[in-house]
Design a protein with these regions (language model features):
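Structured loop/turn residues at beta-strand edges in well-structured enzyme cores
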Residues: 31, 54, 66
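Non-catalytic, surface beta->alpha helical segment in thiol-disulfide oxidoreductase systems
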Residues: 60-89
Length: 89
């Protein structure tokens, strides 16, 4: 299963921008991809360490329950479209 997880934090404008970029990118693809946003406060200390979420927004791409991409910061939607094409062939 293909999945994108956006880890955010309260008051993060970059997180809002990345959320919009991901939503727009998902509208440009016909691939079946689950999209989830998580606030960092929902994660345990162990999850934060395992996912290496030290800065925000952190975008994680999963394919078959394995992380295939970890990106920090904001990107335009067209870059996210490219990531989808590369990671979810």
């Amino acid at each position: 299963m293909n999945k994108i997880v956006l880890v955010t934090t309260k008051g993060c404008e970059g997180c809002n921008i990345m959320h919009k970029s991901i939503k727009q990118a998902l509208e440009c693809t016909s691939k079946k991809i689950e999209y989830v946003t998580k606030d960092v406060m929902e994660l345990t200390k162990e999850e934060k360490s395992k996912l290496k979420t030290y800065d925000f927004p952190t975008t994680l791409f999963y394919k078959n329950d394995r992380i295939t991409r970890r990106e920090v910061g904001t990107r335009p939607y067209i870059v996210v479209v490219r990531w989808i094409d590369v990671d979810f062939k």
